[in-house]
């Protein structure tokens, strides 16, 4: 008898996971609380853009969507910093300046993944199903006005997961909210073209707050403000909004003709890091943000969730299709990696909002890139290891420490050699 799998959540991870499982010949029911977003439009409050990099592309390639994703994306090979005076400074993401992260519409990618899941034999999509509970012992799911049952239930329903809530009794659960929120705004095309360089992620670093802008294929930019929530609340009139932006982001104001109206109309989202254990209870397991929501400052949320799907699929192969063994292996493989990228994402907020504007940081970045070019793969920056490889997140800090020790030893040897040469020359004199 074919096992029936329930995936709760038809977002990015849920759709990818359903497709991977269907390719194993499994019957998969995907339950989504929203109406079909391909017909209902984007959900308010969700980030409009995603940054997809090597990990996400590797996962999407397994269902034949990597090339389509790149065709719909805009590559960003570095970041452009906007100072208070309007001066610009560019920092490439890679040593040779060629590697890029890719700006893509969240809605567009979700639609492509929904289409791919719907095409897969054995997948059934159920929209308008809001989960109210799941029994981890029986696999029984309760929705508003309906019930279902599955052999395995996979919760891919986001940071505020209803599946996680159903199994969280006795769970080691931590939800840490930043005092900052986020709000999205728009820089429209200017005379039919991009108002800013589209090959770059734009950052207005202002210490405790910042604004970023990512390009869209319609030649607009989606801007995201990261401010203390009290600052958002204080700007309650068009005049106050414009005054604050003229003070903090003066060069952006002329590019945003609907700034005040958009600011007052658009919601403020929360920034939360979720860590929990166990991810697996009985017939139920958590995937993506439901297991490990992270803040967006390394652009790895979707990439990390996609890696979960790949690891779960890989664990099924390793276990010979034994679900309890596969789920246990999946959690063991992914938990440390999720914790590692959660920490790095939090650290990157400080880098993006403060450090990138520092001349010292810029010099360090140039030196790191010089080392990468000189040492040919023996030294790779943390950013490149995270964004442009599939090396497990949990291994990156250890590799960085080993690199630093090696570089320190090489630098010490070079300095010693220079010193010895100077002494020898002095003696010859």
Predicted regions, residues:
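Conserved hydrophobic helix-helix packing surfaces used for dimerization/oligomerization
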Residues: 5-7, 28, 284
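Conserved FAD-binding catalytic core of PHBH/FMO-like flavoproteins
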Residues: 115, 120, 129-133, 138-267, ...
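C-terminal helical "tail/cap" subdomain of flavin- and related membrane-associated enzymes
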Residues: 314-429
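Conserved mid-domain beta->alpha element of the FAD-binding
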Residues: 10-23, 154-155, 185, 267-351, ...
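Beta1/beta-strand and adjacent pyrophosphate-binding region of the FAD-binding site
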Residues: 1-13
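Active-site-adjacent segment of FAD-dependent monooxygenases/related oxidoreductases
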Residues: 43-116
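Glycine-rich FAD pyrophosphate-binding loop
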Residues: 22-45
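Conserved Rossmann-like nucleotide-cofactor binding loop
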Residues: 13, 36, 160
């Amino acid at each position: 008898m074919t096992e029936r799998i329930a995936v709760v959540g038809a977002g990015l991870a849920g759709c990818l996971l359903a497709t991977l499982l269907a390719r194993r010949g499994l019957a998969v029911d995907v339950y989504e609380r929203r109406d079909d977003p391909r017909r209902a439009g984007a959900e308010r409050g969700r980030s409009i853009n995603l940054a997809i990099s090597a990990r996400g592309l590797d996962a999407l390639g397994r269902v034949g969507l990597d090339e389509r994703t790149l065709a719909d994306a805009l590559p960003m090979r570095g970041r452009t910093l906007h100072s208070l005076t309007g001066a610009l400074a560019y920092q490439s993401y890679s040593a040779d300046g060629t590697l890029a992260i890719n700006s893509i519409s969240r809605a567009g990618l979700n639609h492509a993944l929904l289409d791919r899941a719907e095409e897969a034999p054995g997948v059934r999509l159920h929209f308008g199903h809001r989960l109210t509970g799941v029994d981890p012992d029986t696999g029984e799911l309760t929705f508003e006005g309906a019930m279902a049952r599955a052999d395995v239930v996979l919760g891919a329903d986001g940071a505020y997961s209803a599946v996680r809530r159903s199994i969280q009794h006795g769970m080691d659960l931590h939800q840490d909210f930043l005092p900052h929120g986020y709000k999205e705004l728009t820089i429209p095309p200017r005379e039919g073209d991009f108002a800013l360089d589209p090959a770059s992620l734009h950052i207005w670093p202002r210490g405790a707050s910042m604004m970023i802008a990512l390009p869209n294929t319609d030649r607009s930019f989606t801007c995201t403000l990261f401010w203390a929530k009290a600052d958002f609340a204080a700007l309650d009139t068009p005049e106050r909004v414009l005054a604050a932006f003229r003070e903090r982001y003066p060069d952006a104001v002329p590019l945003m003709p609907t700034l005040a109206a958009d600011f007052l109309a658009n919601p403020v989202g929360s920034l939360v890091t979720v860590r929990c254990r166990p991810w697996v209870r009985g017939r139920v397991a958590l995937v993506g943000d439901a297991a490990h929501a992270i803040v967006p400052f390394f652009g790895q949320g979707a990439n990390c969730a996609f890696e979960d799907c790949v690891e779960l699929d890989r664990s099924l192969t390793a276990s010979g299709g034994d679900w309890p063994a596969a789920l246990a292996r999946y959690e063991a493989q992914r938990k440390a990696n999720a914790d590692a990228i959660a920490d790095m994402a939090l650290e990157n907020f400080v880098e993006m909002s403060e450090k990138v504007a520092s001349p010292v940081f810029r010099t360090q970045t140039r030196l790191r890139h010089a080392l990468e070019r000189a040492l040919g793969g023996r030294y790779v920056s943390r950013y490149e290891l995270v964004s442009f490889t599939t090396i497990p997140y949990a291994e990156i800090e250890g590799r960085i420490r080993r690199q630093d020790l090696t570089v320190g030893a090489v630098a010490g040897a070079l300095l010693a050699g220079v010193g010895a040469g100077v002494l020898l020359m002095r003696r010859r004199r």
